[in-house]
């Protein structure tokens, strides 16, 4: 058991190196800035990454720690009717891109999550986002895979083992949620209103 814990901690320490932490801080800044400007965040992924997308949206719409107003974040994998209608009539590969086309405005952010970096529907969504003038965050293993050229704010790790990538992702987006919330609301005196 001790070996397993130490191995996981070593993986996390390697992942959160200075370069990755700088990228993380840049991402926090852009998410806070775009929310403050009235833009929204769209998030997409498959499987565990779809669950992560829902988790991120819930933290922003609800709250992470502070009692504050909701922030506009939408997970694109949550509407079964939309997902199945589009996939049945057209193709699953563009199921997120179609929603980006429907919901996004210039200045919004698309956050694509893919542990492999090669999820076709996430890639197509990122392509649509670039066409529409959105900012893009890419969160992936495998050094970014095919998301590299489509990502303005990369959060890529060199890890190839999916469970380890997912653990890194969880810590990463919790940090983003925590710090975006703090930047937007703690200065207004809400730091004393921490939810428990």
From Swiss-Prot:
It is found in: Cytoplasm. It holds the Pfam family SIS_2. InterPro entries: GmhA/DiaA, Phosphoheptose_Isoase, SIS_dom, SIS_dom_sf, SIS_GmhA/DiaA_subfam. It comes from Crocosphaera subtropica (strain ATCC 51142 / BH68). The reaction produces a racemic mixture of D-glycero-alpha-D-manno-heptose 7-phosphate and D-glycero-beta-D-manno-heptose 7-phosphate. Belongs to the SIS family. GmhA subfamily. Keywords: Carbohydrate metabolism, Cytoplasm, Isomerase, Metal-binding, Zinc. One of its GO terms (biological process) is D-glycero-D-manno-heptose 7-phosphate biosynthetic process. The keyword Isomerase applies. The lineage of its organism: Bacteria, Bacillati, Cyanobacteriota, Cyanophyceae, Oscillatoriophycideae. Its main location: cytoplasm. Gene3D superfamilies: Glucose-6-phosphate isomerase like protein, domain 1. Catalyzes the isomerization of sedoheptulose 7-phosphate in D-glycero-D-manno-heptose 7-phosphate. Substrate binds at residues 46-48, 59, 88-89, 114-116, 119, 166. SUPFAM superfamilies: SIS domain (SSF53697). Its cofactor is Zn(2+). The gene is gmhA. This is Phosphoheptose isomerase. Pathway: Carbohydrate biosynthesis; D-glycero-D-manno-heptose 7-phosphate biosynthesis; D-glycero-alpha-D-manno-heptose 7-phosphate and D-glycero-beta-D-manno-heptose 7-phosphate from sedoheptulose 7-phosphate: step 1/1.
């Amino acid at each position: 058991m001790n070996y397993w814990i130490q191995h996981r901690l070593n993986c996390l320490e390697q992942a959160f190196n200075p370069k990755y932490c700088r990228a993380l801080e840049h991402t926090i800044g852009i998410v806070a800035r775009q929310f403050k400007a009235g833009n929204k965040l769209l998030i997409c992924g498959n499987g565990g990454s779809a669950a992560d997308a829902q988790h991120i949206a819930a933290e922003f719409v609800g709250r992470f720690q502070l009692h504050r107003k909701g922030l506009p974040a939408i997970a694109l994998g949550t509407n079964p009717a939309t997902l199945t209608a589009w996939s049945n009539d057209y193709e699953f590969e563009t199921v997120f891109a179609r929603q980006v086309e429907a919901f996004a405005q210039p200045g919004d952010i698309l956050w694509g999550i893919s542990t492999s970096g090669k999820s076709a529907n996430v890639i197509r969504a990122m392509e649509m986002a670039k066409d529409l003038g959105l900012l893009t965050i890419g969160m992936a293993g495998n050094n970014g895979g095919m998301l590299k050229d489509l990502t303005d704010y990369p959060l890529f790790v060199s890890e190839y083992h999916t469970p380890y990538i997912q653990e890194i992702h969880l810590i990463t987006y919790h940090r983003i949620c925590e710090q975006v919330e703090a930047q937007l609301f703690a200065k207004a005196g809400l730091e004393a209103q921490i939810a428990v």
